[in-house]
Amino acid sequence: MDGLPGRALGAACLLLLAAGWLGPEAWGSPTPPPSPAAPPPPPPPGALGGSQDTCTSCGGFRRPEELGRLDGDFLEAVKRHILNRLQMRGRPNITHAVPKAAMVTALRKLHAGKVREDGRVEIPHLDGHASPGADGQERVSEIISFAETDGLASSRVRLYFFISNEGNQNLFVVQASLWLYLKLLPYVLEKGSRRKVRVKVYFQEPGHGDRWDVVEKRVDLKRSGWHTLPLTEAIQALFERGERRLNLDVQCDGCQELAVVPVFVDPGEESHRPFVVVQARLVDSRHRIRKRGLECDGRTNLCCRQQFFIDFRLIGWSDWIIAPTGYYGNYCEGSCPAYLAGVPGSASSFHTAVVNQYRMRGLNPGTVNSCCIPTKLSTMSMLYFDDEYNIVKRDVPNMIVEECGCA
């Protein structure tokens, strides 16, 4: 399949398939179905890799004069698919960005990521391809939340964090930590000795405004640096009550005497702003049926997988999706002879959903023949900002078409 006409005609089928992924809400307001009375003109030679039956069998064929509009429709369908998989109603409204220095520090600490010369973040395994080993039953999310402050005068420093619980899912917190930077000021010490302080973090019990629990850690300091304190129980309790705001009071015993300064929310120290890291998992009990499929190589007319890459910069999403830089919105195309029909598993249920959509739109389902559709979908890792400016690292299931079949 070469050139824009081929890609756009293939996109006609994918538009229908994407709507099937998203469910009824993806269709928007009802529009009249295409008339099945007159057969469409044949596509340009080679436009679909050899078979005009591909899209007519799926009910998604469009005439050449409609192809320009269809590309835009296709991209909108892909956007809705991504937001649906992230359980978001719309893209976040990024009115003010998290300070770049703070974000870069957190990413380097947690992911060994790097910032390229063009300012884009590059992180191993977040390249838009399927995540290695991510198709198992266990789905893991990683959430990074940066500290804010109420500015209250107190002997303690009060910080708070808005921590997303990923669409109110039943998440189990595997590990959660507060990262705090301790800065050493000039101070005369005996040779070989270290500054020893005790950091205490008081966290407010959800639902009990007057009750505080504490975690503490003894720290021996030789130089300025980052230190972590465990908050697993505090954040698990927060999630269980359906709350998002985590209030912390931080004390440092011995810091003043030994010229140790914990860095909190300081405009002059953005790269050392405290942050909380939450690793949580959601167990998915569903099993996938694995099937082998064909790759579209220009030599086959049968149902196959066509690779298609979407750069997030080109659709205006690079301001809230940190990594990957784009999405492999692969799709299925090709003919489905009778001997290839009836692929079991996810294909059958998918085809049922598509036919039901056509029933609601008034199209006779008897005219819908066997269709080339995804039979295996894989997970993709994403790093993005949510509505609360948390950085979320999430393995998102059913994002990338890996194999295609007929049903």
From Swiss-Prot:
Subcellular location per the Swiss-Prot or TrEMBL entry: Secreted
Pfam families: TGF_beta, TGFb_propeptide
InterPro entries: Cystine-knot_cytokine (IPR029034), INHBB_C (IPR000381), TGF-b_C (IPR001839), TGF-b_propeptide (IPR001111), TGF-beta-rel (IPR015615), TGFb_CS (IPR017948)
Location of the region described as Disordered in the Swiss-Prot/TrEMBL record: 27-60
Highest taxon listed in the record's lineage: Eukaryota
GO molecular function list: cytokine activity; growth factor activity; hormone activity; protein homodimerization activity
GO biological process, one term: fat cell differentiation
PROSITE patterns: TGF_BETA_1, TGF_BETA_2
Keyword field contains Transport: no
Proregion residues excised on maturation: 29-292
Chief site of localization: secreted
Disulfide bonds: C296-C304, C303-C372, C332-C404, C336-C406
Keywords: Cleavage on pair of basic residues, Disulfide bond, Glycoprotein, Growth factor, Hormone, Secreted, Signal
Record carries keyword NAD: no
Biased composition annotated in UniProt, kind: Pro residues: 30-46
Chain positions carrying an annotated carbohydrate: N93
Signal peptide range: 1-28
Gene Ontology terms: cellular component: extracellular space; perinuclear region of cytoplasm
Subunit comment: Dimeric, linked by one or more disulfide bonds. Inhibin B is a dimer of alpha and beta-B. Activin B is a homodimer of beta-B. Activin AB is a dimer of beta-A and beta-B. Interacts with FST and FSTL3.
Function: Inhibins and activins inhibit and activate, respectively, the secretion of follitropin by the pituitary gland. Inhibins/activins are involved in regulating a number of diverse functions such as hypothalamic and pituitary hormone secretion, gonadal hormone secretion, germ cell development and maturation, erythroid differentiation, insulin secretion, nerve cell survival, embryonic axial development or bone growth, depending on their subunit composition. Inhibins appear to oppose the functions of activins. Activin B is a dimer of alpha and beta-B that plays a role in several essential biological processes including embryonic development, stem cell maintenance and differentiation, haematopoiesis, cell proliferation and wound healing. Signals through type I receptor ACVR1C, abundantly expressed in pancreatic beta cells, and type II receptors like ACVR2A. Upon ligand binding, these receptors phosphorylate intracellular signaling mediators SMAD2 and SMAD3, which form a complex with SMAD4, translocate to the nucleus, and regulate gene expression.
Family, similarity comment: Belongs to the TGF-beta family.
Protein name: Inhibin beta B chain
